[in-house]
Amino acid sequence: MIETRLLQYFLAIAEEQSITRAAEYLHVTQPTLSKQMMDLERVLGKQLLIRGKKKVTLTEDGAYLRSKAQ
């Protein structure tokens, strides 16, 4: 079972399109949020995010998870 907190973190990143901005919004550190997302991806066995220099983009699996988690 996926923790609700992890889904909230994921949705914030999807909304902000930035791990840094999502971390600020969620009042957690950027490294903590990044690690949580890597753990979520590992648990699901799917890449959810494409991490660019300026922007985070959802993969197809990430977009699917977003649609189900909202």
Description of each model-found segment:
Residues 36:
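Residues in the recognition helix of alpha-helical DNA-binding motifs
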Residues 41-58:
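A short LG(V/I)-centered, amphipathic sequence patch enriched
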Residues 24-25, 42, 63:
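Alpha-helical residues within the helix-turn-helix
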Residues 62, 66-70:
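Coiled-coil helix of the DHp
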